[in-house]
Amino acid sequence: MLNPKLKEQNMQRLAVYREGLKAMPQIHNLFFELTLRCNERCLHCGSSCGDVPSDEMTTEQWCGIIDQLKEDLGTEGSMLCITGGEPLLRTDFFEIMGHANELGFNWGMTSNGTLITEEVAQKLRDCGMKTISISLDGMQETHDAFRRTPGGWERGLQGVKNLVKVGGFQSIQVTTVVTHQNIVELDALFDVLKDIDIDSWRVINMDPIGRAKEHPELLLTKEDYKTLFEYIRNKRIAGEPVCYGCSHYLGMEYEREVRDWYFLCTAGLYTASIMVNGDITACLDIERRPEFIQGNVLNEHFKDVWENKFQIFRKDLSLENEKCRNCKEAKYCHGDAYHTWDFDNNCPQVCFKDVLFD
């Protein structure tokens, strides 16, 4: 384990930094939810995407928003993070993102990879995409069943290979959602990925949000979590580019061991999202309730909403719950991630205190 004293000092500094962000938030990651349509039907999808009605803004509306962001905020220091659904299902995708590129925005995307032919990969590079994360959730049979998409694994993997072949991107990442079912396939999937020149493998656990609430049997057990974090730590010790995602406070044992820095939920602090219909919120994984919608870009400037609202996201959740208030880790955890907080009962749905540490 890394030096515990140094870890604690760094976590204390991060807590001070978080307090500063609450007072003076700085937008770094702005998500564009271009569509809720998707050609896959993932059992864990936080947004319940698929063959669903998608009240999408038009090409002109998205381009107008990009113009407004350029005028109000500039392009330095922020990243447009494009997501869905599957963003590439929009026939105007390259028109919208080409416009963002022309104005000087840095942008990246999450995708299932199934639509990324070599030609599409070239177009993504040519219109300025910097980073991309492709989902591969286990080996072929498991992935296709989990995403309810026959052939999805093969097409997604080929999408990764096409991106690597074309090249010219800052980062090509594969993301794997780990479940009780596919955790046994991590080694096999690693063997597949190590022969492809990707930049990183991001491994995250399935959270009880969206459709995942209907499949509790897929959530990781206490033993699964320990297996997962030991697996990631050992890979990182061996110099492999594997990391755990940003969600959840992991305690002294695993913080900074399984990812590049310490836990900080940035929702509303330096992360915000523009939803498919123009609504403004913090993180797209947060439950879609009226009180979390801070405004709409069709009738308000994003900058005004960001600077004058978002108070619901700029507080310490650990103060809302007795268990958290009495926890010695609260000063670093702050109630954990907003997207797994139970706002009806004022308690975290995911807490690793009883799983990883006392």
Say what each PLM segment does.
Residues 2-6, 54, 126-281, 285-297:
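Radical SAM enzyme [4Fe-4S]-AdoMet core and its adjacent flexible, acidic
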Residues 2-28, 48, 279, 285-358:
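Flexible mid-to-C-terminal extensions adjoining Fe-S/redox cofactors in radical SAM and related proteins
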